[in-house]
Amino acid sequence: MAPRYHSAAEADTGVCGETKSRDSDALYDLPLRDPEEDQTTVALHPGSGEERFPVFQSEFTSVPVSDGGANGVTYPVGGSRKEQDEISSRGPPAYSLEIRGKTSEQLAESGADDEGTNGEKQSLLVPCLAVFSSNYNFTVTSIALFLMNQDPLYKDASDTVVGSSTVKMLSYAGAIVGMCTMGYLGDLIGRRLAMILTLALVFIGALLSSICAWGDGVTVLVIMGVCRFVLGVGSGGVYPLSAVSAAEGAGSEKSNDRSMRVSWAYSMNVPGIMFPYIVALVLWCTTHNVDVCFRILLGFGALPALLIWLPAWRMKEDRAYVAKDFAKHLAGVFVSRSYWRQLLGTGVCWLLYDVTAYGILLVQPEITQSIWGNSSSVTDVIWQNIILNGMGIPGCFMGILVLKQMGVKWLQFWGFVGLAVSAFLMAATVEILQGKAWAQLVLLCIVNFFINWGASITTFILPSLVFPPEVRSTYSGISAALGKIGAVGGIYTMKAILSTGGLTPMMICAGVPSLAAAILTWFYVDPVPNTLRSSFLQCFGSLAGSCPFIDCRKFRRGSRAFE
């Protein structure tokens, strides 16, 4: 997966990295692509003539521009206001570089960055609460249906065609649709308007699923399924839009700054997953009325969307992110083969991660009942899931803490390895620890830690870093949609295996996709032509980064992206 820049000095080798030109100390950001040739083309306009040269394997490039004088002064194009003031004081360059239809002189006059809102850092309030809202609404479906099964009316309906599994499936089907459509709208009409639309759908879907589901058990589940589909479209759209908005609002082109902002936005994922169980515990301890409990649980999901709807209207956005021509934008999204290759590192890894993560997380009530037995009370099951999901909090924040140290690639790699090993370990000890419920719960907590420690963060970050701004939201949505496809497959697969084969085969099947994703991460995330020895040095050297006080970046010099 190519990083955001590389220099003209590396054009012949295709090696990617954020380095300076061999002819100059200046860096230039030139987003010019020729999708048909699957390469970058930089156009130079020396007076009346025109020169072009190709630069492969990169979305942006860096070239020196000479003023033609005796001193051989070079001029940065784009860049910060200070750099552009220096350009003005030296005089105009002899070559005019066209960037997205603008010459370097026009860019220098406007002082606008190629990306972002003119370098102004934006608040993380909307992305953070949007992520919280999305994960709350995805998770609350499972716990609400679990509570509904305590009532014979709904329990009998769950055994029909429109059972609880169908309601969950409709929620995730809506999410897949929302991720693709809202991600695309984020590029077409802008991140702000698309976010406003997604929040409106979340509010409507959550509210209607709470107040409109009345009647017999089957009718309630049918209405709830339709409403959760609408909510899923909105909640799914939150994923690409919140990640891209957080990254582009960094006020900086540095991938470290962007990745940290996206990771902090994603940190609301764990509270969003955990909060439905806390609300359910309070409600169930207050009243054992199933109707009251599940309706308040579902309706609460509308509140975060309502709270941030007005701040979303006030979000600032650069017009450069809005597609001017619908047809050209549509063609540009799907024409480049390099984008689809990058999906192996973003979308397919996300798919494999969600097979494991959602397969385990959303059947945790069933897993805990298989550990403790069906005699556990509703309160016990809720407490057990609060404890399990609570392990995600240190996992998530420890992952964020070492993100800069380890780098996105190796944090994802070791996250997948840790998740696979912990799942296999739990599978191997099920028979040994039979009857020792708390020992099995500890192992399940370790699995939950690795679910949130590595790949959970990086799969959310990567699409917002590696794709160019014109298609960033679209491909972030496609990557997230692939993840939700994996989630749907994981839910059905893990639940079926758990009910037929037990916990041991289920945990084995949960570990295999993580192992496959670790292999894909090695080869398709930031691929750099290193020797095998160098790659292993980077890989195992990055383990030192798991300690926040040790700088392991010197071990990863051959892997320059996302540092």
Swiss-Prot record:
<dbReference type="GO" id="GO:0015293">
    <property type="term" value="F:symporter activity"/>
</dbReference>
<feature type="topological domain" description="Extracellular">
    <location>
        <begin position="1"/>
        <end position="127"/>
    </location>
</feature>
<feature type="topological domain" description="Cytoplasmic">
    <location>
        <begin position="364"/>
        <end position="380"/>
    </location>
</feature>
<protein>
    <recommendedName>
        <fullName>Inorganic phosphate transporter PT2</fullName>
    </recommendedName>
</protein>
<dbReference type="GO" id="GO:0046943">
    <property type="term" value="F:carboxylic acid transmembrane transporter activity"/>
</dbReference>
<feature type="transmembrane region" description="Helical">
    <location>
        <begin position="478"/>
        <end position="498"/>
    </location>
</feature>
<feature type="transmembrane region" description="Helical">
    <location>
        <begin position="128"/>
        <end position="148"/>
    </location>
</feature>
<keyword id="KW-0472">Membrane</keyword>
<feature type="transmembrane region" description="Helical">
    <location>
        <begin position="292"/>
        <end position="312"/>
    </location>
</feature>
<feature type="topological domain" description="Extracellular">
    <location>
        <begin position="462"/>
        <end position="477"/>
    </location>
</feature>
<feature type="topological domain" description="Cytoplasmic">
    <location>
        <begin position="434"/>
        <end position="440"/>
    </location>
</feature>
<keyword id="KW-1133">Transmembrane helix</keyword>
<feature type="topological domain" description="Cytoplasmic">
    <location>
        <begin position="214"/>
        <end position="217"/>
    </location>
</feature>
<feature type="topological domain" description="Extracellular">
    <location>
        <begin position="402"/>
        <end position="412"/>
    </location>
</feature>
<feature type="region of interest" description="Disordered">
    <location>
        <begin position="67"/>
        <end position="96"/>
    </location>
</feature>
<dbReference type="GO" id="GO:0006817">
    <property type="term" value="P:phosphate ion transport"/>
</dbReference>
<keyword id="KW-0812">Transmembrane</keyword>
<feature type="topological domain" description="Cytoplasmic">
    <location>
        <begin position="149"/>
        <end position="168"/>
    </location>
</feature>
<feature type="transmembrane region" description="Helical">
    <location>
        <begin position="218"/>
        <end position="238"/>
    </location>
</feature>
<keyword id="KW-1003">Cell membrane</keyword>
<feature type="topological domain" description="Extracellular">
    <location>
        <begin position="313"/>
        <end position="342"/>
    </location>
</feature>
<dbReference type="InterPro" id="IPR036259">
    <property type="entry name" value="MFS_trans_sf"/>
</dbReference>
<feature type="topological domain" description="Cytoplasmic">
    <location>
        <begin position="285"/>
        <end position="291"/>
    </location>
</feature>
<feature type="topological domain" description="Extracellular">
    <location>
        <begin position="526"/>
        <end position="563"/>
    </location>
</feature>
<dbReference type="Pfam" id="PF00083">
    <property type="entry name" value="Sugar_tr"/>
</dbReference>
<keyword id="KW-0769">Symport</keyword>
<feature type="transmembrane region" description="Helical">
    <location>
        <begin position="169"/>
        <end position="189"/>
    </location>
</feature>
<feature type="topological domain" description="Cytoplasmic">
    <location>
        <begin position="499"/>
        <end position="504"/>
    </location>
</feature>
<feature type="topological domain" description="Extracellular">
    <location>
        <begin position="190"/>
        <end position="192"/>
    </location>
</feature>
<feature type="region of interest" description="Disordered">
    <location>
        <begin position="1"/>
        <end position="51"/>
    </location>
</feature>
<feature type="transmembrane region" description="Helical">
    <location>
        <begin position="413"/>
        <end position="433"/>
    </location>
</feature>
<comment type="function">
    <text>Inorganic phosphate transporter. Activity is likely sodium-independent. Exhibits higher activity under acidic pH, implying that either the monovalent form of phosphate is the preferred substrate or the transport activity is H(+)-dependent.</text>
</comment>
<feature type="transmembrane region" description="Helical">
    <location>
        <begin position="193"/>
        <end position="213"/>
    </location>
</feature>
<feature type="transmembrane region" description="Helical">
    <location>
        <begin position="441"/>
        <end position="461"/>
    </location>
</feature>
<feature type="transmembrane region" description="Helical">
    <location>
        <begin position="343"/>
        <end position="363"/>
    </location>
</feature>
<dbReference type="InterPro" id="IPR020846">
    <property type="entry name" value="MFS_dom"/>
</dbReference>
<feature type="transmembrane region" description="Helical">
    <location>
        <begin position="381"/>
        <end position="401"/>
    </location>
</feature>
<dbReference type="GO" id="GO:0005886">
    <property type="term" value="C:plasma membrane"/>
</dbReference>
<comment type="similarity">
    <text>Belongs to the major facilitator superfamily. Phosphate:H(+) symporter (TC 2.A.1.9) family.</text>
</comment>
<feature type="topological domain" description="Extracellular">
    <location>
        <begin position="239"/>
        <end position="263"/>
    </location>
</feature>
<keyword id="KW-0813">Transport</keyword>
<dbReference type="InterPro" id="IPR005828">
    <property type="entry name" value="MFS_sugar_transport-like"/>
</dbReference>
